[in-house]
Design a protein with these regions (language model features):
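Bacterial N-terminal signal peptides that target proteins for export
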Residues: 1-9
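N-terminal presequence-like segments and the immediate start of the first folded domain
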Residues: 8, 12-82, 86-100, 104-152
Length: 152
């Protein structure tokens, strides 16, 4: 009678491997996030989750009524980052999970003032970031910030 014992692990691996490979090849789930009460007329999703990554659309310093907060770059930056924090928190993430930000400024000369507020929202390690001057931000905003984060 032939002895099969040494071949058994190889046989089991050969049978199981295709299923394991198929499970790993499955693309991550994509979820378009539009919170209740968000304007249905917007031509974009405020956030998109792909697997464990959360991609936020650019945020500006609007309050709950959709109006830009008064007070210039400092107030707008604070409100913008508060809006970002709200989206992150609502989607299983947080400011400590942000890995990248893109900052657009209506006037690059306001970079220092924006940065003074920005760092208060990231007291620990800072995410990777790019910043540049841009004209024509929505609602004549002074700043717009877009972020990418991981989800807990």
């Amino acid at each position: 009678m032939p002895r099969l014992t040494p071949r058994l692990p190889a046989l089991l691996l050969a049978l199981a491997l295709p299923g394991v490979l198929r499970a790993q090849d499955k693309p991550p789930e994509v979820k378009f996030i539009v919170p209740a009460g968000a304007a249905a007329t917007l031509p974009f999703s405020p956030a998109v989750r792909v697997g464990y990554m959360l991609y936020l659309a650019g945020q500006i310093g609007t309050d709950s009524t959709g109006r830009l907060v008064p007070g210039g770059i400092e107030a707008e930056t604070r409100q913008t980052l508060t809006n970002i924090k709200r989206v992150l928190d609502a989607n299983g993430s947080g400011m400590d999970r942000v890995v990248r930000c893109l900052v657009m400024l209506a006037d690059i000369a306001e970079w220092g003032t924006m940065n003074g507020v920005y760092v208060t929202f990231f007291p620990g390690p800072k995410p990777a970031r790019s910043a540049f001057g841009a004209s024509g931000l929505a609602l004549s905003a002074r700043v717009e910030i877009e972020c990418t984060a991981t989800v807990r």
